[in-house]
């Protein structure tokens, strides 16, 4: 069974090494870089299962800032993955990676299921030893884990469409809502999980919030400490 991981990058020298390391168990990791000025590409190229596929489409924003087109970048990656005829495509951000338990079980889970999609719970970290539990349990009582998209079967006609400030997932012409209503789904729950490191460095969080506001991409961008809920210590089982 061929498992292909796809990831977008731009100036991710802090994260691309740990990301690629966490997916050594995959057959290929396709890194599509959108114009890094740091060492992202050279770091990624050190991993034997990594393929580099550049992406050049830019969206000009306010104050001379720019970013890569989100859905265009994602669709480019999906097309590159499909060229390899994968059985599964795993898609995530460079700042999100599987914990040790999911890393160890990931291949067996995908090889052993007849599902069309695999969903996993993401723990959103603050620093490196705390997380926001309500982000992983967003329903009103905050009691039930809510997994989100992690992987899909390669043969599916899966793609994305811009819906600023993010994008929609689609299968064919159908917008993908709750996949449990339309497809066979493997829900991966803790202690197996994904660790989202987008907020692991408070100073970088401040810079990211400033970028979104000053670029006009998300003018009302809020700081996670104001909307993500209370903080809990990171559970021992969540370790890498």
Regions from the language model: what does each represent?
Residues 30:
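Conserved beta-strand positions in the Rossmann-like core of class I SAM-dependent methyltransferases
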Residues 11-25:
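Short, well-formed alpha-helical segments that are part of the catalytic scaffolds
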Residues 2-4:
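Cell-envelope/extracellular polymer assembly enzymes that use nucleotide-activated donors
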Residues 7-9, 33:
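Short beta-strand/turn micro-motifs composed of small residues
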Residues 45-91:
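Active-site-proximal specificity loops/subdomain of glycosyltransferases
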Residues 33-46, 57, 93-96:
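A conserved acidic beta->alpha catalytic loop
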Residues 64-79, 97-240:
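Catalytic-site signature of metal-activated, phosphate-bearing donor transferases
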Residues 26-27, 48, 86, 94, ...:
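Short, well-ordered alpha-helix to beta-strand connector turns
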């Amino acid at each position: 069974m061929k498992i292909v991981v796809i990831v977008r990058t731009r100036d991710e020298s802090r994260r691309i090494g740990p990301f690629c390391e966490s997916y050594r168990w995959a057959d290929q990791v396709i890194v599509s870089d959108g114009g890094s000025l740091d060492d992202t590409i050279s770091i990624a190229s050190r991993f034997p299962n990594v393929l580099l596929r550049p992406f050049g489409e830019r969206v000009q924003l306010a104050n001379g800032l720019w970013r890569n087109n989100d859905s265009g970048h994602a669709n480019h990656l999906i097309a590159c993955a499909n060229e390899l005829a994968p059985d599964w495509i795993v898609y995530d951000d460079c700042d999100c990676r599987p914990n040790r338990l999911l890393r160890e079980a990931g291949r067996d889970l995908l090889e052993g299921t007849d599902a069309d999609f695999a969903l996993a719970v993401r723990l959103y970290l603050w620093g490196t030893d705390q997380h926001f539990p309500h982000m992983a349990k967003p329903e009103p009582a905050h009691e039930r884990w809510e997994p989100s998209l992690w992987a899909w079967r390669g043969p599916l006609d899966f793609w994305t469409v811009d819906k600023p400030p993010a994008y929609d997932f689609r299968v064919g012409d159908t917008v993908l809502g709750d996949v449990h209503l339309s497809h066979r789904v493997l829900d991966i729950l803790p202690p197996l999980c994904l660790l989202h490191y987008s907020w692991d460095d408070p100073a970088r969080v401040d810079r990211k919030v400033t970028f979104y506001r000053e670029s006009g991409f998300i003018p009302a961008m809020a700081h996670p400490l104001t909307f993500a809920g209370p903080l809990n210590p990171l559970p021992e089982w969540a370790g890498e």
